[in-house]
């Protein structure tokens, strides 16, 4: 299988040399192709229609946040060719201010994934017919899967019985938020476990 994927990687690099930045087949036998963001639609259309590829099934689209990188986000697409029995991972690395072209014209179902990525990461897809939040409320502040999003969020939502509507309020913690130093030994409560008294008795006899 890995030999077949290596041949496919060479084929894609040759046929779409302007699109492909790099290819890799890892130890698990998975093919990854990094594509120039602006060329994403043309490359994915080629994957779908080329007779050697025939990656007609979009499995999913997701994103990964790498805050320390200049190109902060990886947008990752997974495709399946039921004709060739192959899978391929396609990725594009983009900056925070960059946009990606929507592939919903090639794979109509991609629209839902792109909305989710916009909602969770704030990545914009140009040419999307309805790029709205999907999982959070329309007035939600921030994008929850970014690494710089606070674990408490910015606001909390509750239903107000007096106002008879949902209200947004600043986050109010019932206890102080604790930062743990996981590089240091934990200094917590001292618990007495069954059998500890025997160790104490033995230590007393030795003394």
Swiss-Prot record:
InterPro entries: NADH_DH_suC, NADH_quin_OxRdtase_su_C/D-like, NADH_UbQ_OxRdtase_30kDa_su, NADH_UbQ_OxRdtase_CS. Its main location: membrane. Gene3D superfamilies: NADH:ubiquinone oxidoreductase, 30kDa subunit (3.30.460.80). Keywords: Cell inner membrane, Cell membrane, Membrane, NAD, Quinone, Translocase, Transport, Ubiquinone. GO terms for cellular component: plasma membrane. The keyword Flavoprotein does not apply. The keyword Transmembrane helix does not apply. GO terms for molecular function: NADH dehydrogenase (ubiquinone) activity; NADH:ubiquinone reductase (non-electrogenic) activity; quinone binding. Coiled coil: none annotated. It is found in: Cell inner membrane. Its EC number is 7.1.1.-. It is a peripheral membrane protein. It catalyses: a quinone + NADH + 5 H(+)(in) = a quinol + NAD(+) + 4 H(+)(out). NCBIfam families: NuoC_fam, PRK06074.1-5. NDH-1 shuttles electrons from NADH, via FMN and iron-sulfur (Fe-S) centers, to quinones in the respiratory chain. The immediate electron acceptor for the enzyme in this species is believed to be ubiquinone. Couples the redox reaction to proton translocation (for every two electrons transferred, four hydrogen ions are translocated across the cytoplasmic membrane), and thus conserves the redox energy in a proton gradient. NDH-1 is composed of 14 different subunits. Subunits NuoB, C, D, E, F, and G constitute the peripheral sector of the complex. Belongs to the complex I 30 kDa subunit family. This is NADH-quinone oxidoreductase subunit C. It comes from Jannaschia sp. (strain CCS1).
């Amino acid at each position: 299988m890995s030999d077949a994927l290596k041949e496919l990687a060479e084929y894609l690099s040759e046929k779409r040399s302007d699109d492909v930045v790099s290819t890799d087949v890892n130890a698990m036998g998975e093919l990854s192709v990094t594509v120039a963001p602006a060329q994403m639609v043309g490359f994915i259309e080629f994957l779908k229609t080329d007779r050697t590829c025939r990656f007609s099934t979009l499995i999913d689209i997701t994103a990964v946040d790498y805050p320390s990188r200049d190109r902060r986000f990886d947008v990752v697409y997974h495709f399946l060719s039921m004709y060739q029995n192959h899978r391929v991972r396609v990725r594009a690395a983009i900056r925070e201010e960059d946009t990606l072209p929507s592939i919903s014209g090639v794979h109509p179902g991609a629209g839902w994934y792109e909305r989710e990525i916009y909602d969770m990461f704030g990545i914009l897809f140009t040419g999307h017919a309805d790029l709205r939040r999907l999982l959070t409320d329309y007035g939600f502040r921030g994008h929850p899967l970014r690494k710089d999003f606070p674990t408490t969020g910015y606001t909390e939502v509750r239903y107000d019985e007096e106002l008879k509507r949902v209200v947004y309020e600043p986050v109010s913690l019932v206890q102080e938020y604790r930062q743990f130093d996981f590089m240091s030994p934990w200094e917590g409560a001292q618990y007495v476990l069954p059998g500890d008294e025997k160790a104490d008795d033995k230590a007393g006899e030795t003394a």
